[in-house]
Structure formats: structure tokens, C-alpha cells
Amino acid sequence: MFQFTFATAKLHFVPSDGVIQGSSPSKPDIRCQPEPSARASASYMKALLGRFGTGPASVPLAIGSYNSGEGGLSSNLQKALDSNSGLPRDFWTLIANGDKLSKQFQAENFKYVPKFFAAAIVGENPQDFGLNLQPISTYSK
């Protein structure tokens, strides 16, 4: 029997995500190997986009779910929607209803999604930030 307790790796996998994406006690932990971890991360994000959707209101939910877990995001979103009917099903509804959500979700997820978008902006425009790199979208394998 094995047990992971904390998220690890460059791409922040918790144990259950790692197992879902191919990590197991019989293999070296792929969560700490860059290429397998990146592939697993992309696969997991694709699954989350399949669950939450690819529209402009849905992608931030999928990103937030990557950080907090599908259950954590879904339960907090439901709390926010239950407290104010008529609000859109989006990340900004979570922000607007933060006082009704778990403290852990507020502390981590409220920062994670904006940081994700900030990293994407820097990754696509590295020269604007003084980085001598090509935009991330120009790299291929």
C-alpha cells in the first residue's frame, strides 16, 4: 500500500490525479519527471475542459478545478450559485461570493486562476517582460 499526502511536481499533481494520469507505486513517480508530468497534466486539463466546457466562462472553472480538485470546485460553485440565484456559472461568481466558500478555496484558488492567466500572458509575450525567449506557442516537439 502507498500513500501520497501532498501535491508535488512541477505541474502540481496530488496523489489521486497522479494515479489517474498513470503514476503508480510500481513505477517511479512520474509527477517529478518533466515530460511525463507535462503529458499527464495536459491530459488531465483536457479531461477537465471536457467536464466544465471550453467557453470563456468555463475555462477558468477548469483551471480552478485543476488546482482545487473537481469536487472542491464543484461544491464551492454550488454554494455560490445556491446563495444567489440567477448568477452565471463562472469563476467570477465564486469570487463575488467568497464569504460563502471554504477558507482553503478562498486562500488558494482565488489566486491560482489569475496567476495561471498571468503566466500564459508572459509565456506568449516573453519579450514584453524582458525575457529572451520565444512565445510558448512556437515550441513544438
Task: Report each predicted region and the residues it spans.
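Outer-membrane beta-barrel proteins
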Residues: K46-G50
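Substrate-binding/active-site groove segments that recognize
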Residues: M1-S26, S37-M45
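Extracytoplasmic and endomembrane cell-envelope/extracellular-matrix remodeling and assembly machinery
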Residues: V19, S24-P28, E35, R39, ...
